[in-house]
Amino acid sequence: MGDNQDMGKSFLETVKFDDRGLVPAIVQDQETGKVLMMAWMNLESLQMTLDKKRACYWSRSRNKLWLKGESSGNMQVVHDILIDCDGDTLLLKVSQTGGACHVGYHSCFYRKATEALSMEICDTLMFNPEDVYGKKS
């Protein structure tokens, strides 16, 4: 039998943010079940995602909110947000426009280990990142 002790709490009260105020969010294509990416959310990005039904994350490298698709056009429409049994990981089920990965692939998990312990590409390249974000200097 499942543990229903948190069922009286609101969704936001159930989320256990870490000491930096973040919670990991796994992002999955709602139609295919394919895992697209993992990102971090803080309370503000989670509230924005819940309000707008568009994925918003917290960028640790830029130290600011990141509305997915803001610069690339590759947005994520959020259909469901699930929380794990411990309350410390979220699962977003989304409809992905274009590629989810900033290097141009449909999924950030576009490489797999071979038996020889090398890597091979196992996903579809959706766009050229230089065309979308410009060349890195």
From Swiss-Prot:
GO terms for biological process: L-histidine biosynthetic process. Its EC number is 3.5.4.19. Binds 1 Mg(2+) ion per subunit. Binds 1 zinc ion per subunit. Its cofactor is Mg(2+); Zn(2+). Zn(2+) binds at C85, C101, C108. It is an enzyme of class 3 (hydrolase). This is Phosphoribosyl-AMP cyclohydrolase. It comes from Pelodictyon phaeoclathratiforme (strain DSM 5477 / BU-1). The gene is hisI.
